[in-house]
Amino acid sequence: MPRFITELKRTHSCGELTKADIGKEVVLFGWVNNRRDHGGAVFIDLRDRAGLTQVVFEEDVRPDVHELAGQLRLEYCVGVRGKVVSRGGNVNPKLPTGEIEVHASDLEIFNRSEPAPFQIEDKIDTGEEKRLQYRYLDLRRAPLQQTLMTRAKVNHLTRNYFTDKGFLELETPFMVKYTPGGARNFLVPSRLNPGKFYALAESPQLFKQLYMMAGFDRYFQIVRCFRDEDLRLDRQPEFTQIDVEMSFVEQNDVFDVMEGLVVKLWKEVLGIEIPRPFQRMPFEESMAKYGNDKPDLRFDMPHVVLTDLVRQHDGGGVPLMHEAVKAKGIVKAMRVPASANFSRTEIDKLEEYVKGMGAKGLARAKVGEGGEWTQSPLAKTITPALRQAINDACEAKAGDLLLFQFGKESVVHTVMANLRVHLAKRMGLIPEYGSGGAWRFLWVVNPPLFEYDEESGQWAAAHHAFTRPHDSDLQFLESDPGKVNCYRYDLVLNGFEIGGGSIRLHDPEVQARVFKAMGISDEEARSKFGFLLDALKMGAPPHGGIALGMDRLVMLLTGAESLRDVVAWPKTQKGTDLMTGAPGDVDARQLRELYVKSTFEPK
């Protein structure tokens, strides 16, 4: 064992010594962050997760220690003993320890380091693949260490908050029954049950509801979940969520508890007071004004739905708009203020941008002093009455730019939603990443319970089949499922959905009606969810809950650019771990024991 470990103990971290510690003898452990020789003395910056301390090895104090210090190189792991002294006029104001240094009297090298494949510095140009391959070195860099320490603090604050509120931290299984539909699952073959498979849980949904039925009326868990989906910058195959469920509540009770948590996190982590209650917006309004159910409210530029106006004016001289309305599509406009002052070249680039999302083009018009339209093919055919009606609906002023999309509702919403955010970044209204100093929380409420699947010709649950419909909409369950709204809610922050939940169905008769509306027979429902249906008949209480995405929450709190920056050991967009080589091959013997055979044939 190293002498410093058995005989000496660390007295301080490398980030806590100040001038109040001058004269003390201290023991520090860490890594050599920097090394330089000056006037016969060896200087190093010693680093641990708390910060940096300058250490000086002088030849006339301990020649043997000075000689050993001459061997030090970057990333050597060492222990140092010495006295804290003032740096006099050589203060480094950038460091919390910048007023002092440690004059070393003893040194032990715990381990030497080969030259690192990249610099261990705050900002580096190394590609992400190399950093992921040597993730343990990447994690030595201060920005990532600060991010993970913030994540640990969020974990701690969350547990304390819910415990103080009377919640129980309870576990749910990772290996569960596979049920078709929903997210694609990771499957685990069962050796003891040949031909059978577990699924890794994509959420604790059913088990946390069963906790409510078992009488544990306040549950929470910081839990790992798994989804075998195509990955993006904001997705990982395994992710963490703050999972919550409560009995005897309505959605306002859930809002109250979760707003309390969010306010506490922003206060404790960032020192920012977030006002309550959070804004609420119906799903229908969110889609109409912003094109999605996670609007960024840090800036304005809402969409205006013109479908009824175009219908009232019988097309108003714009055949393409008229055709979209007759085809049961939608017509939308967005007013870009004159202050944006986009050139024709810039507007042409906007058209290329929307075409990349499947749009056929970008209709536009510049508003003149008298309300006339210029720089627009629409101006040649549109009737003065429809033009004025659109100007009024959009509150257009001279110099403003009007942008239009019309066609299939889902495409128009998506294109206009993305265009709005793209424009805001181009105009400097929001930064490319991070909050830009503003935090606009929003509850999006009352969405449809069902969405129509054109391929299957069936209604499907927009989220899951266990969400409670509005009582006033139960009359439409059989006759017109598209009219049924529900007690589902999403918590949105600056264009990101950071959580979602619902009030659950606790009435077995209504649950059966919901399944039938989705085309799920009694036999299929019992095969998939028989245990839950039985539990609903055993005095199930009214209950509801929510889950917050821990990874995204920390990403927003820290200003990170992607989820991979807030996860210690992330996967690539192909789902691979470049450090360990996962996923890897399995030998044939093990596959035989699992009764599994690979049909993959390499090209």
UniProtKB/Swiss-Prot annotation:
Main location, first listed in the record: cytoplasm
Residues that bind L-aspartate: 227, 463, 504
Leader sequence segment: none
Role according to the record: Aspartyl-tRNA synthetase with relaxed tRNA specificity since it is able to aspartylate not only its cognate tRNA(Asp) but also tRNA(Asn). Reaction proceeds in two steps: L-aspartate is first activated by ATP to form Asp-AMP and then transferred to the acceptor end of tRNA(Asp/Asn).
Class of the enzyme per the UniProt entry, highest EC level: ligase
Gene Ontology molecular function: aspartate-tRNA ligase activity; aspartate-tRNA(Asn) ligase activity; ATP binding; nucleic acid binding
InterPro entries xrefs: Aa-tRNA-synt_II, aa-tRNA-synth_II, aa-tRNA-synth_II/BPL/LPL, Asp-tRNA-ligase_1, Asp-tRNA-ligase_1_N, Asp/Asn-tRNA-synth_IIb, AspRS_core, GAD-like_sf
Places the protein is found: Cytoplasm
Binding site residues for ATP: 227-229, 236, 497, 549-552
PANTHER family assigned to the protein according to its UniProt record, in alphabetical order: ASPARTATE--TRNA LIGASE, MITOCHONDRIAL, ASPARTYL/LYSYL-TRNA SYNTHETASE
GO BP, sorted A to Z: aspartyl-tRNA aminoacylation
Catalyzed reactions per annotation: tRNA(Asx) + L-aspartate + ATP = L-aspartyl-tRNA(Asx) + AMP + diphosphate
Keywords: Aminoacyl-tRNA synthetase, ATP-binding, Cytoplasm, Ligase, Nucleotide-binding, Protein biosynthesis
Protein name as it appears in the record: Aspartate--tRNA(Asp/Asn) ligase
Region ranges (Aspartate): 205-208
Residues annotated as site: Important for tRNA non-discrimination: 38, 89
Subunit relationships: Homodimer.
Family statement drawn from the similarity comment of this UniProt entry: Belongs to the class-II aminoacyl-tRNA synthetase family. Type 1 subfamily.
GO CC annotation terms, alphabetical: cytoplasm
EC number assigned by the record: 6.1.1.23
